[in-house]
């Protein structure tokens, strides 16, 4: 399976750090966040990665090159105008060759067995699988409603209309999708990938949720950036295992 890392964001809440460095290149434990995610992908057998670029985008290829230094192959998708999660993924669709793709955020660090996630996606014959977390403030992050059979039926209130017994989850920004879902999105326009998932649900596509309770950090604010450095120092992230390949 190929992967895509979303790395085009402006990182406005981390200014002034992001005035001169794109957020995915900010270091944690001395290594850029996006490199930790590349190493996690490699550890789970993924070697082909697409990275989208916008804000200070030239710096990311300068840092990562073509991926050969990591034993990987990196293709870049440049966005002259930022396209959001949906538009960015749709622009890169040509690189997926009609096959499912694993999507990660370049500014999120987590400990997840990606092999188990990919196995679940295949076993469920899903059009999309969203990694979900239990969170008392799920609605603040964007409420995802999932049945006891792990089927996602509504996202931010949109999706299936009939009343169903559901549990509240938040979307962790880690997902697998089949490119056919991208047909619902406009080309060359900023949009959210969640729009494609909502349309898929309404069209009867199988959109599944995968619960994940392990370490996860969206490094979006100075406070969370400082916290993830402390978490790494405390060993909550097994970064050394990624760097050695064990």
Predicted features and spans:
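Catalytic-core segments of class I nucleotidyltransferases/pyrophosphorylases
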Residues: 46, 100-102, 109, 115-122, ...
């Amino acid at each position: 399976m190929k992967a895509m890392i979303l790395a085009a964001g402006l990182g406005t809440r981390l200014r002034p750090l992001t005035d001169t460095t794109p957020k995915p290149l900010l270091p944690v434990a001395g290594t850029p966040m996006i490199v930790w995610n590349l190493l996690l992908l490699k550890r789970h057998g993924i070697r082909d990665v697409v990275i989208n670029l916008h804000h200070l985008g030239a710096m990311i290829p300068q840092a990562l090159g073509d991926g050969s230094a990591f034993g990987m192959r990196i293709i870049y998708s440049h966005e002259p105008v930022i396209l959001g999660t949906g538009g960015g993924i749709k622009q890169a669709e040509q690189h997926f060759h009609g096959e499912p793709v694993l999507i990660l955020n370049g500014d999120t660090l987590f400990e997840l067995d990606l092999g188990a996630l990919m196995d679940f996606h295949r076993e469920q014959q899903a059009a999309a699988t969203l990694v979900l977390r239990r969170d008392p403030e799920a609605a603040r992050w964007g409420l995802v409603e999932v049945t006891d059979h792990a089927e996602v039926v509504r996202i931010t209130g949109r999706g299936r209309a009939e009343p169903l017994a559901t549990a509240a989850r938040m979307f962790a920004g880690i997902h697998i999708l089949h490119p056919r879902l991208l047909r619902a999105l406009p080309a060359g326009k900023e949009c959210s990938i969640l729009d494609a998932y909502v349309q898929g649900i309404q069209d009867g596509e199988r959109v599944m949720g995968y619960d994940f309770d392990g370490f996860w950090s969206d490094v979006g604010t100075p406070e969370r950036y400082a916290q993830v450095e402390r978490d790494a120092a405390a060993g909550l992230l097994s970064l050394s295992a990624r760097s050695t390949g064990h």
